[in-house]
Amino acid sequence: MTTYVAHVQVLQALHGDEDLLSRLDELGLVERRAEGYLPEEVERALVSYTLVRELGINWEGVEVILRLREELLATHRQVARLLGLLTELGPASPGDSGHPR
């Protein structure tokens, strides 16, 4: 089941910054639905708030930072998955270089 965060809750977290939320929607970074926002959209909105309102970064910079952030998070998940697989395989045999012959 998908969890949503109500519009009013997101606005509270953004200190009532409706303009910022509207801009994020225009840019396709969040989508306003009747049910509310997805948790990852709320996180994106909070990061955007910090970047724009507190650090003065322009919207083009925000888009780049958010894209790079999401790529970094995806890479982190992939590395964690690979580490899990390696752990399942167990330690390599002595003398095994780990390379196929």
Walk through the language-model features, giving the residues of each.
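The alpha-helix within a helix-turn-helix
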Residues: 11
